[in-house]
Amino acid sequence: MEKEAIYKLIRESPPGEVNQVVHDIRDIGLSDEEAIHEQLKLYHEDYNSSVSISDDEKVIISADNRLEGNRYYDQVLQKSFTINYETMEAENVEDYTEAIKIPDEIVKQIKKVASDHYLSDVTFGIIKKSDEVESFTIVLVSSKYNPKNYWNGSWRCICNYNVSEKKLEGRSHIRVHYYEDGNVWLDASRPISATVEETSKLYEVLAQVENGIQQSFNVELSSLNDKKFKELRRQLPVTRQKINWENVSGIRMRNT
């Protein structure tokens, strides 16, 4: 029962708020530290959290780039590292040359997508598991945390590019939590499916697909605000009486 509660509470944590959730879990007496550590690891892997391994280098963590002994690696930077899941700090950073080298042409195009189309803090990773198949897992993550204004959010693009099949397939995910005078959650995703005739067109295709997904989210959010949220607002009563606005400043609520 305790492990299930820990799983659900951590799993449903909004972007940028999981540490506060863990703090609250301990405050209410859930003290299975092994379960907390395991769920923290899975949370950061599943939502592709990023960590800094140097002053100017950030990497993504996932189940796909995990090594034995609780280590992870970045195929582009050719580095491996461990992680403190509570502080989200990379530790024991080492060179790692055993992974397959990612072609420069692909790295340059994904870097360009990140720099041209992501306004907030963005990190990317590219993973290739086999020399036999020209297939690359591409992960782009952009997060923006603004707790002073009561909102946090993240955008993730996870797709697979198969060179021989000329296919780009995956999903883009958006998760936003707004909690000023309420508690509004947005957790949605859209499929990615496109043809990439040649590797040199990867930037163009991925940028076009992501722009289309963003526009579809914008349309849906506009509709949500104009229709669904309006239905939730309390309708003021119609009294059909005129108000003497000059005397409004002198009105006081009667004690009840």
Swiss-Prot record:
A GO term for molecular function: actin filament binding
- UniProt KW Cytoplasm keyword: yes
What the entry lists under PANTHER family is as follows: F-ACTIN-CAPPING PROTEIN SUBUNIT ALPHA
Self-association or partners: how does it assemble?
Component of the F-actin capping complex, composed of a heterodimer of an alpha and a beta subunit.
Question: What is the organism field in this record?
Answer: Schizosaccharomyces pombe (strain 972 / ATCC 24843)
Protein name (Swiss-Prot/TrEMBL): F-actin-capping protein subunit alpha
Sites bearing Phosphoserine, chain numbering: 31
Concerning PROSITE patterns, the annotation shows: F_ACTIN_CAPPING_A_1, F_ACTIN_CAPPING_A_2
- Cross-referenced Pfam families, in alphabetical order? F-actin_cap_A
